[in-house]
């Protein structure tokens, strides 16, 4: 079983370090690239989308932090689901998260490999994907300390890059930089702020939520805090920082060029600076995109490997994935993660582009389903009152709005149904698991 608060080893992580790790695990291709899709869908109202998504994410993390403070668990949200609703909830939650993260790692590998191919066009995509996959696994192999330091350093680099864009954008708006003959594009009417109406805001909301994906890793890391009750403080700092720099940077990008200039294929930061003769800066940003994608890739690998070991402890995964006493790494768990990575790379290269995109959309949605279960678990285990209960219900409404918005967009609708298909498969496996557990628990006939 998972460790209880009494026998939980004391952590050595300060709350601000968890905040920094959270930034490292969150700022990735979901923001640097995914925000362009949100802009295309929503226009200027994308700023409202990011504010809504930031608030919703904060409400979810606040509940996860309360659970972590009450009883730190290695399995985090999976352990809390098990406590709240039984073995089936822990089992299904774990495998929903594992499946979604492995699919997401495939898209992350593809994205950072494409960025690298910009500099080395002759090298096949799979070569870069393989190199980044091995590097990511090496960081996980070296242990928790190296993972923490890596995410801290990459978090600083990514945050500095966003601040660099903000400074450059302000200089451009002030006319200090040469080029960029588009003028400043400020929406003067409601119809200009909502160019695609309420439906545009609705369908773009899901991509704003994707930019905040990563709080689950903070939940898994919260057990290493010196004071688990400070998890809430680290989440507040991290999410407030992200929401502010996200909204300011995207707002500046929108002011620099006309809306029709943005495309789903290019980062809004590259699009907005293209006319300013800043080739070196654009190359620097290409490098930042690689760092950002690699950072979130490593976070995903850490999460799935750690969670797999914990699930094995709880009987929700084969016992061979249990971390042996005195060992720092579970080789079978790392091996399965490697196998999942290889499969993700193959799928991204072999499957038709639209089918693979539907699968990665489904993976992002499944991550939000995990967030919903965090809310359900908190409602049952913490018995919230007043503002706590209001936060839970508001977060549920906001997540439901983001998920349902995919049904009204032709490109994302198939991803919703693919996510439901994955849930059905995992539900069937869960029922088989429950049945087998029932047979094990049943006393033998005399």
Curated annotation (Swiss-Prot):
From which source organism is this entry? Bacillus subtilis (strain 168)
A Gene Ontology term for the protein's cellular component:
plasma membrane
Similarity remark: Belongs to the amino acid-polyamine-organocation (APC) superfamily.
Q: What is this protein called?
A: Uncharacterized transporter YcgH
| Example GO biological process | transmembrane transport
Q: Name one Pfam family in it.
A: AA_permease
**What is the annotated localization of this protein?**
Cell membrane
Q: Which residues form a coiled coil?
A: none
Keyword entries, A-Z: Amino-acid transport, Cell membrane, Membrane, Transmembrane, Transmembrane helix, Transport
Tell me if Zinc is a UniProt keyword of this record.
no
Encoding gene, per UniProt annotation: ycgH
Q: How does it sit in the membrane?
A: Multi-pass membrane protein
Q: Which residues cross the membrane?
A: 20-40, 42-62, 95-115, 127-147, 160-180, 205-225, 237-257, 284-304, 331-351, 355-375, 388-408, 414-434
């Amino acid at each position: 079983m998972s460790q209880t608060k009494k026998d939980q080893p004391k952590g050595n992580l300060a709350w601000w370090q968890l905040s920094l790790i959270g930034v490292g695990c969150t700022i990735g291709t979901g923001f640097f690239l995914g925000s362009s899709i949100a802009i295309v869908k929503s226009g200027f109202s994308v700023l409202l989308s990011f504010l809504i998504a930031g608030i919703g994410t904060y409400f979810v993390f606040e509940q996860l932090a309360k659970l972590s403070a009450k009883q730190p668990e290695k399995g985090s949200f999976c352990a809390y689901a098990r406590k709240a609703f039984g073995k089936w909830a822990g089992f299904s939650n774990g495998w929903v998260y594992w499946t979604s993260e492995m699919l997401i790692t495939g898209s992350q590998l593809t994205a950072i490999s494409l960025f690298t191919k910009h500099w080395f066009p002759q090298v096949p995509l799979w070569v870069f994907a393989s190199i980044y996959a091995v590097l990511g696994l090496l960081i996980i192999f070296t242990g928790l300390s190296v993972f923490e330091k890596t995410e801290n350093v990459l978090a600083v680099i990514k945050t500095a890059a966003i601040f660099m864009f903000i400074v450059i954008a302000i200089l451009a708006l002030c006319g200090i930089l040469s080029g960029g003959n588009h003028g400043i594009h400020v929406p003067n009417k409601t119809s200009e702020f909502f160019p695609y109406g309420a439906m545009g805001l609705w369908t773009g909301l899901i991509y704003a939520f994707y930019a905040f994906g990563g709080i689950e890793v903070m939940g898994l890391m919260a057990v290493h805090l010196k004071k688990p009750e400070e998890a809430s403080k680290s989440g507040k700092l991290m999410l407030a920082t992200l929401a502010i720099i996200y909204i300011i940077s995207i707002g500046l990008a929108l002011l620099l060029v006309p809306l029709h200039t943005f495309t789903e294929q290019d980062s809004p930061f590259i699009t907005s600076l293209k006319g300013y003769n800043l080739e070196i800066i654009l190359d620097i940003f290409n490098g930042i995109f690689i760092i950002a994608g690699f950072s979130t890739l490593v976070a995903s690998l850490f999460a799935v490997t750690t969670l797999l070991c914990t699930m094995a402890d709880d009987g929700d995964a084969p016992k061979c994935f249990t971390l042996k006493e005195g060992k720092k790494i579970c080789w079978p768990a790392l091996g399965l993660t490697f196998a999942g990575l290889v499969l993700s790379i193959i799928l991204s290269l072999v499957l038709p582009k639209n089918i693979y995109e539907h699968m990665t959309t489904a993976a992002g949605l499944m991550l939000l389903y995990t967030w919903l279960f965090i809310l359900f678990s908190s409602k049952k285990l913490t018995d919230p009152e007043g503002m706590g209960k209001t936060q839970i219900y508001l977060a549920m409404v906001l997540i439901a709005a983001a998920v349902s918005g995919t049904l009204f967009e032709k490109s994302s609708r198939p991803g919703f149904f693919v996510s439901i298909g994955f849930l059905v498969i995992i539900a069937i496996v869960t029922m088989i698991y429950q049945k087998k557990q029932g047979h094990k628990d049943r006393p033998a006939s005399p």
